[in-house]
Amino acid sequence: MKILVTGFDPFGGEAINPALEAIKKLPATIHGAEIKCIEVPTVFQKSADVLQQHIESFQPDAVLCIGQAGGRTGLTPERVAINQDDARIPDNEGNQPIDTPIRVDGKAAYFSTLPIKAMVAAIHQAGLPASVSNTAGTFVCNHLMYQALYLVDKYCPNAKAGFMHIPFMMEQVVDKPNTAAMNLDDITRGIEAAIFAIVDFKDRSDLKRVGGATH
């Protein structure tokens, strides 16, 4: 099994991005699966262009995109990506699309095809906080998740794809009182646990367990 893992460069005034730092620490093989990690720019269309190049060349069985969600307390596999860019801040090249479809020929939304509840369970087993998230936002993270599912559907129809948000690193919150953060090694362990579940559930349906929210 081959798994493509992506991590964004820093954005929004941050000097580092835990997504990129964490995937740099991943081993080349996890649970027998070959792991390929790539950096993607925090730029709307350009991130998808980079992803497409690697999907076409690597032909992965699964794509896991990782992104920073400052303020979240745990690792959060995303359930759904919507076909809408609505940028609160500009991306790293100054683009700020407002109420713009990501793909005019795409679906209104794509659900993750990764075993998100099994991923949460595996992260819990590693002793780390995790939960299913029902919104990936409307910035580049949602954009890339949507594009990943669109591109996999087009170029690797038998592959799975999805996204997981991670918290700030400890170094990012020294001047942000009362802001949640996690040690980089723990973030990396959480991603490894999630990948273990992706491999383990390659030919199985996801766990059927409570993971919803009331609001």
Curated annotation (Swiss-Prot):
A Pfam family: Peptidase_C15
Major enzyme class: hydrolase
Gene3D superfamilies per record: Peptidase C15, pyroglutamyl peptidase I-like
Keywords: Cytoplasm, Hydrolase, Protease, Thiol protease
PROSITE patterns linked: PYRASE_CYS, PYRASE_GLU
Keyword hit for Membrane: no
GO cellular component, as recorded: cytosol
InterPro entries: Peptidase_C15 (IPR000816), Peptidase_C15-like (IPR016125), Peptidase_C15-like_sf (IPR036440), PGP-I_bact-type (IPR029762), PGPEP1_Cys_AS (IPR033694), PGPEP1_Glu_AS (IPR033693)
One biological process term in Gene Ontology: proteolysis
Subcellular location, record wording: Cytoplasm
Catalytic activity: Release of an N-terminal pyroglutamyl group from a polypeptide, the second amino acid generally not being Pro
Active site: 78, 141, 165
A molecular function GO annotation: pyroglutamyl-peptidase activity
EC number from the UniProt entry: 3.4.19.3
Family named by the database record: Belongs to the peptidase C15 family.
Role noted for this protein: Removes 5-oxoproline from various penultimate amino acid residues except L-proline.
HAMAP family with a match to the protein in the record: Pyrrolid_peptidase (MF_00417)
Subunit structure: Homotetramer.
Protein name as it appears in the record: Pyrrolidone-carboxylate peptidase
Record organism: Streptococcus pyogenes serotype M3 (strain ATCC BAA-595 / MGAS315)
